[in-house]
Amino acid sequence: AREKVGIIGYTTKETPVLSNPGPYLEFRDEVEELQIHANKLTTLGVNKIIALGHSGFFEDQRIARKVKGVDVVVGGHTNTFLYTGSPPSTEVPAGNYPFMVQSDDGRQVPVVQAYAFGKYLGYLNVVFNDKGNVIKASGNPILLNKDIPEDQVVKAQVNKMKIQLQNYYSQEIGKTIVYLNGTTQACRFHECNLGNLICDAVIYNNLRHPDDNEWNHVSMCIVNGGGIRSPIDERANNGIITLEELTSVLPFGGTFDLLQIKGSALKQAFEHSVHRHGQGTGELLQVSGIKVVYDLSQKPGSRVVSLNVLCTKCRVPTYVPLEMEKTYKVLLPSFLATGGDGYHMLKGDSSNHNSGDLDISIVGDYIKRMEKVFPAVEGRVTFLDGTLFQAQLFLTWGLCISLLFFIL
C-alpha cells in the first residue's frame, strides 16, 4: 500500500549573520515553525514526517525532542560524522548512526548527518508502525570510494563541464611542504596554520613604502575560521597547490578590506570570537600581527586575558598591549566588515571602510611569490591551561547528555 510521507525543510535562524539573505526574508525559530507545519501535515492524514534541514547537530537534536509529529531528522551545517561500528576512513564519529533521541512525548526519533564534501552518502533504513512511529532505524554513511560505481549520466555531464574549467582550475600556484590544516575541527576551535597563511598573505599584499613614522600602515589581519572551508594535503599531488584547491579553501568570492576601528571594538570582537566556543560555529578568529590569550573558564564576554598587537610606528616591530581608545587599522574579510557572523562591532561605513582585493587573488599571489610555503602554529591564539580541552569536550559531552537522556 502507498504511504504518505511529509518532508519539511528548515534552516538556521542565524542565517542573517552567517550569510547575506537581504532585508526581506525572516528567519524564525526552527522548532516553533516546524511544529506549525507538522500540525498541518498531521491534519492532512500524514503520520510519517521527516524534518530535512541545515541548522547543526545540536539543533537537530532539539527538533527531535520538541517537535511533535516529526519522526526523522536529517540535518547538516555542522558536518557531523556519525557512524556505528568501525569507521571506514579517517573521520572520528561523534556518535552512532542513526543518533537516537527520545522525544518529549516518548517516541524514538533518529537523527542523522553524513559529514561533508560529498565523501559519504547517508543511508538510513526506517521501519514505522501503523501509527507512524519509528520502531526500528538502522544504517550507516556509505564511503564513496572507488568501490562505488559512478553514475554514468552524471559523470558525463561533470566531465563536459570539467573540460571547460580544466585549464583554469589546473593552474599550479605553488607548493606546500606541510599539511595546510583548514578543517572545521582546527580552524573553528583553535589556531590553524592555514588561517595563519591566509592572514600573512593579506598583510603582505598590503605592504606599502615605509616612511619616517611607520614601517607599514597596517600590521593586523583577522579572518573568521568559518570562512576557511577546506584543507590542502601536502602528500597529495606532491604538495602542488592548484587554483582548484585554493578555490575550495576560499569559495565565496569575497575581498579583504581595510577597516579603522577603536581598540575597544577590536577587544569586543575577540570576546565575540569565543563567546560560544566549542560548538563548532565559525566565529573564532585566525590572525596575523595579533597575539591573544583566552580563558574559557570565564563567562562569555570576559574571556580575553590578554590582547597584544604588532606596532607599526616602530623600527623594530614588537607586540604591545592593545589600547582601548586608540584607533587601529585592521585587514579583514568583507563578510566581517559588513557585520557577518554576528560581528556587528566590525561593521564599517564609507568613513572607515575601504574595499580591497579578491581573497583568492591575494593568497594565490602570495603563494606564487613564496613558491614553497610551510606555515606553522605559532601561539598567535592560545588558551589558558585546561580551558581549551574542556571546550573541545563540549560537543562530546553534549552527545553524552543526549544519550544518557535516551537511556534513562
UniProtKB/Swiss-Prot annotation:
It is a lipid-anchor; GPI-anchor. One of its GO terms (cellular component) is side of membrane. Optimum pH is 7.5. The keyword Chaperone does not apply. Gene3D superfamilies: 3.60.21.10, 5'-Nucleotidase, C-terminal domain (3.90.780.10). Residues 385-388, 385-408 form a propeptide. It comes from the Eukaryota. Is potently inhibited by metal ions Fe(3+), Cu(2+) and Zn(2+). Is enhanced by Mn(2+). Ca(2+) and Mg(2+) have no effect. AMP binds at R188, N224, R229, F252, F335, D341. It is found in: Membrane. Zn(2+) binds at H54, H77. Optimum temperature is 5-37 degrees Celsius. Expressed by the venom gland. Coiled coil: none annotated. GO terms for biological process: AMP catabolic process. Keywords: Disulfide bond, Glycoprotein, GPI-anchor, Hemostasis impairing toxin, Hydrolase, Lipoprotein, Membrane, Metal-binding, Nucleotide-binding, Platelet aggregation inhibiting toxin, Toxin, Zinc. Glycans are attached at N167, N181. This is Snake venom 5'-nucleotidase. It comes from Macrovipera lebetinus (Levantine viper).
